Amino acid sequence: MTVIDNHEAVGMEGAPRLSEASARDYFELLKPRVMSLVVFTAFAGLILAPGHINPFIGFTAILCIAIGAGASGALNMWYDADIDAVMSRTAKRPIPAGKILPQEALAFGLTLSAFSVIILGLAVHWLAAGLLAFTIFFYVAVYTMWLKRSTPQNIVIGGAAGAFPPMIGWACVTGGISVESIVLFLIIFLWTPAHFWALALFKMGEYGAVGVPMMPNVCGEATTKRQIVIYAVLTAISGICPTLLGFASLGYGALATALGLGFVGYSLGVLRMPEGDKRMVPAKKLFAFSIVYLFAIFSALLVDYAIARIWFGGVI
């Protein structure tokens, strides 16, 4: 199947005027599901960081990070409009569906990017703003425009963009980067390949049709399955590092170990999956559990922190 370059073509014939795009269409352009994970992990970084931040400033910080994440999503949809129109899971996005013009999405994304970075710098901290600006640049220019269509390691390197939010949240409070914030970064960074390669396995045909060189399409199912197990193990190890490094309790460590074993267990299910299995049930199960894993790990860190504050320092 040939992919048409829709950066100019998508939405041009019979395209709606700006006034015809609803607020919901623009909200969908922000990738709200992805944004929810970004906001949650950034919030975790902000809460777990030592020190105090004014609640209003903290809210402003999280809002700016959310807007920056949404801006990245809008710019990603602008650039990927051609392949989004072909893939079933993305064909209903606002640009390929003809609800928003590509140039509108570009202007929207650039405006929100600048707004989020400037406000975060002025209201909170310029290091945090710099990290947010770098994250937006890395996701849009490095991952979306370069890596995604050029190498099967796209998600490994590009996954760094999704791992920065807790580090940004941490920097909003402390004005710096620490070992703890790097560990939070690593948990997400190492989690990303197994999560997305599980998706790539059961969407292999669609990625192949649009020319995106995902690991299963370039290196085959067997290699992808082995790589998934390796990254699942690394993710499980990184998940217990907060306890090993002394900034989370043994209770958290026990829960993180159980979650990590579950993650590895699901990855082994993918490894045992027969070659050419069209149903890809183990891959779908791993993909679903990986989302649960990440939310559970960061939730456990927050609960562990709250218990420690109440036990040792009174009511938060």
Swiss-Prot record:
EC identifiers of the protein: 2.5.1.141
Alphabetical GO biological process terms: heme O biosynthetic process
GO-annotated cellular components: plasma membrane
Catalytic class of the enzyme: transferase
Catalytic activity reported: heme b + (2E,6E)-farnesyl diphosphate + H2O = Fe(II)-heme o + diphosphate
Membrane topology, from the record: Multi-pass membrane protein
Pathway: Porphyrin-containing compound metabolism; heme O biosynthesis; heme O from protoheme: step 1/1
Compartment annotation: Cell inner membrane
Transmembrane segments: 34-54, 55-75, 95-115, 118-138, 155-175, 182-202, 228-248, 250-270, 287-307
Keywords attached to this entry: Cell inner membrane, Cell membrane, Heme biosynthesis, Membrane, Transferase, Transmembrane, Transmembrane helix
Recorded GO MF terms: protoheme IX farnesyltransferase activity
PANTHER family assigned to the protein according to its UniProt record, in alphabetical order: 4-HYDROXYBENZOATE SOLANESYLTRANSFERASE (PTHR43448:SF7), PROTOHEME IX FARNESYLTRANSFERASE, MITOCHONDRIAL (PTHR43448)
Other remarks on this protein: Carbon 2 of the heme B porphyrin ring is defined according to the Fischer nomenclature.
Protein family per UniProt: Belongs to the UbiA prenyltransferase family. Protoheme IX farnesyltransferase subfamily.
Protein name (record): Protoheme IX farnesyltransferase
